[in-house]
Amino acid sequence: MASNNFRLQYLKIENYKNIKCVEFDFSNKNGVTLLIGNNGCGKSNILEALSSIFAGLYQSRLHKPDFDYIIRYSINNNIVEISLSGSSYSISVNNKSFSKTEFSVRKDCLPKNVIACYSGESQRLWEKYYWPYYSNYISTIKKSVTIPELPMIYINRYNIEIALLTLFFYDFDTFEDIREFCANTLKIKHIQDITLHYNPKKIREWNDNAVLQMVKMLNDVDGVPVLSADKITLSLDELKSKLSYMGERELFKVLYAATMPKDDKVITSIELNLELNNGDLISCSDLSEGEKK
């Protein structure tokens, strides 16, 4: 059965590192899969293979998988099945065949993003599958009128502030599952205040895209030249009010764009003061490395 949301149904991988031939049937699962095994058995290789598959589907000029696979998933009421054998793709959407070129323009048949979060020390996943997309993204973002899409997103502990802000940007009365996750899993009751630090020099070098529009809205100014302060502190309610024109995905996208360019950051750092369930007040920097991961 097809659905609007992306749902992985079947995956077969052949001859990728120590994976000679493995099949997964996800069709009767609830959307969350846990892989359990000894060190060195290939768990991380499964994540790498999935990343390789979609990296090759988004832009083959940036990456080409070097193994055979079959993947089937549902998205936007479509059933998509893709197989790669050698260098030859076979693609069908609702049992209708498409060439790789034809499929590439079907924006409704690929997930908007593949997001990876890896807590290990190895940088292989990032460097091989996510860095090429990130590098391409960063090279254009500063002068772009609109924020470009980044299909392959790699999250690590340095994105913890963005991740927490995005979660608490949701309306907890509507999204009860997110409220319960923040309260029961993260043990965080509330974000007490948020401080954004800017780089005024870099701000003036950027095009007037969504990143600068956000900065202007937060500071209640009409133009960047009149921006005098290099930081602003707001409550969570103030942030939500000033950025009410944004959805949660847009907030994440804009904050990611503002904070990630190594040499061109508009927002150089984000400080969060958190109220825990037990009433303690801590800063985000007080979280241990394990908690951030």
Indicate residue ranges for each PLM-predicted region.
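Short, well-ordered loop/turn elements at secondary-structure boundaries
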Residues: N5-R7, K29-G31, G40-C41, P65-F67, ...
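Short, solvent-exposed loop/turn segments at secondary-structure junctions
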Residues: Y16-N18, K29-G31, G40-C41, N76-N78, ...
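Conserved P-loop NTP-binding catalytic core
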Residues: K29, L47-T101, C109
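Pre-Walker A-like glycine/lysine-rich segment at the N-terminus of P-loop NTPase domains
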Residues: A2-E48
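Extended helical coiled-coil dimerization/tether regions that scaffold
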Residues: A2-N4, S27, I155, A163-K293
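Electropositive, glycine-dotted interaction segments
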Residues: S90-V215
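Short catalytic/ligand-binding loop motif for oxyanion handling, primarily in non-cytosolic enzymes
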Residues: K20, S44, A55, V80, ...
